[in-house]
Structure formats: C-alpha cells, structure tokens
C-alpha cells in the first residue's frame, strides 16, 4: 500500500511523458487517475512510490483497447442471516496462528516481486494454503498459482459454490524497501504480511467449520494473495483483467491491506470510500458492527492505493477495510522498520473476524 505526499511528487511526475505510443527505452505506462497516464522508467516508479504517489501500471494494456467497465450488478443482504455459524467460526480463529505465520513471512529478506526471496516467500505461502486445504478435507477446495510477467506469482484458493457468482477476499503478499527495492531488507510485517495472514486465517476458519461445509455454500468463495502490488497493482491486474475477459461474475471483493497497526488514538477500522462500491461498503459496515468489537470510520486513500482498485477498474464491486483511518496508518511501512513489534495481534484478529463474516454471509447469500 502507498501513502500520499502529493507535493513531493510534483517534480517527479513532471518528467514523465504521456501518450499512447511507447517511447524508446525501458518505460512503463502508469495511470494516476481515470484517463491520466504517463510514461516512466522503473527508477521513476520507485521514486514516485517512495514519495507517496499512487498509480496503476497499465503497460500490459497497450493494444488491448481496454475500457473501464460499469460494476457487475449485485444484491447484497440487508440483514445478517448466519450469525450462529459465523460466531462459532470466529471462536476458533487463532491469534497464535496470525503471530506464527506473520513471523515466518517477515523472516524473508524481502518479498519484492522481482527478487528471488519474493519467489521463495510466495512458494512458502502457497505451501501454507495447501496445508490448510489438505488438513480440512474439504471436497472440491483447491489452490492454484497464477503467473505474471515477472517472477512472483499470485495465489488463489477456491471453495466452489453451486452458482457462478463469486465472492473474494484478497491481500497483496509482496513487500518493498523503498530505498533499495531489490536487495533491501523489507520484512513487510504490516504492509502487507498482516493482510496476507488475515486472509489465510479466514480460509482456515471457513474450511475448519463443519457447519459451513455441511451448508453447501451457494456462491463460490476465493481467497487471493496478489504479487507485485508495490509495482503498481500488477498481480491483481493480471487476475481481474482475466476475470473481466472471461466474463466472471465477481459480486464482491474485500481487500485486506494493512491490518495490524492500531494507531495512536481510538482503535477503529478505516473504510475506504473512494474508488470502492458504496453498496458493498454499506454491507461491510453491517459486518463490522455485527462481528467486530471496534467501530469503523469513513476514510479515503486516493486513486489506486491498493488492489481493490484493480477489481473496481475492471467492473467488479470492491471494498477495503483498513487498519485505521488512512491518515493514522503505520509510518514504518516500505522500510526495514516494518516489523511485528509495532503491530497489535488483537487488532489483527478483528480483521480476521470481519473477513470471515464477509465471506460466510455472502457465500451463503441467495440471489446475490
């Protein structure tokens, strides 16, 4: 995830050249807002990110005639319908699992999407997802890797439903040291190891529930871990552009990016209200009020601040519940200091409750 510092990036963005024709040299086309594109080098991308500028790298869309799409129609429940099931699942969520998994993710030198340790960390995460599925014995559940045009791969776990309507919870798995992306130490405990382990624990919670497995979920559930978010939402773009071209019926996507920092003031979630789906946001508020023990406040993070923007841009309703109001986010991200010592695992467990409630209520919803 990225944090704004607009004035600091003005000089950097001024040197970029906008235009549909690719210039000579190693250049990337980025989108800083709807219809606002610029050509930049990889070094310029890194400097812009370090200065807080958010963007989507749309280089792979050249020649595809991409057109932003209106959201897929969805009918979200107006009332909680499965509180007994969800409450029993929440009781089995484990703070110890979150601590163990996040410690392991943080031990890689970095999880940068072009580094060798970025691949090694993805392989480790893939093995954890496989283990959860295998130990559950759930029929039909599977995990697959989705390759990108760079080293690190996406991971998608699927619990098939009886309909083609799909509900997603996702998090980016990569990390970055903004001073030295390829080789620098980037434990990425909060950004975004925290979101990654929350999604993993939500998967454990769903698959570990005999009541859920016996209920035969109506809608297909997917748990995503995206590669290359720090390079401009690269991995999530791979996934959602493919889903768009395939005509997938993604009815809801919940993004978990930054889930462990409690902030200095009142403990609360931040509901991202820009570049998200307002109807789905209202549903998220209902989930938080029912299943979490802390409040939620509206906040904004800017265009393309995280992977929900890839879903939204491709026509899929998306929301993001962040660790705090955006202005109170963790100041240690994108550095060697993004470590577990600054995180609160009780707060992270609240995120897991929300993810579990979101997936279960929508997974069981009829006529979504």
Swiss-Prot record:
GO terms under biological process: proteolysis
Co-factor(s): Zn(2+)
Entry-listed glycosylation sites: 92, 192, 216
Cystine residue pairs: 301-305
Record's subcellular location: Secreted
Cofactor info, note text: Binds 2 Zn(2+) ions per subunit.
UniProt keyword Cell division present: no
Leading EC class: hydrolase
Domain of life of the native organism: Eukaryota
Annotated keywords: Aminopeptidase, Disulfide bond, Glycoprotein, Hydrolase, Metal-binding, Protease, Secreted, Signal, Virulence, Zinc
GO molecular function terms noted in the UniProt entry: aminopeptidase activity; metal ion binding; metalloexopeptidase activity
InterPro entries: M28_fam, Peptidase_M28
Main function: Probable extracellular aminopeptidase which contributes to pathogenicity.
Protein name: Probable leucine aminopeptidase TRV_05750
Organism: Trichophyton verrucosum (strain HKI 0517)
Organism lineage string: Eukaryota, Fungi, Dikarya, Ascomycota, Pezizomycotina
